[in-house]
Swiss-Prot record:
Belongs to the UPF0161 family. It is found in: Cell inner membrane. GO terms for cellular component: plasma membrane. Coiled coil: none annotated. It is a peripheral membrane protein. Signal peptide: none annotated. This is Putative membrane protein insertion efficiency factor. SMART domains: Haemolytic.
Amino acid sequence: MRLLARLIALPVRGYRLLFSPWVGFNCRYQPTCSAYALDALERHGPFKGTYLMLRRIGRCHPFGGSGYDPVPGADPKHDRCCGRTP
């Protein structure tokens, strides 16, 4: 992971360590939003990874979707099925 991506990942890791145990593991998606954020930063770098992370967090609300939603490129079979490009 690039240095900038590691810096962006610090608040996500802090959330997972400090807040997630208190508020519960109640993400609407699989993988969880924090796992998605770390995977997006690792796979796509700091800029596209941050974009994907913010887009996912924006969709995670009671009126948003739910279910299996991996990072583009993480599951090629799912990408082909749904017409997503990495």
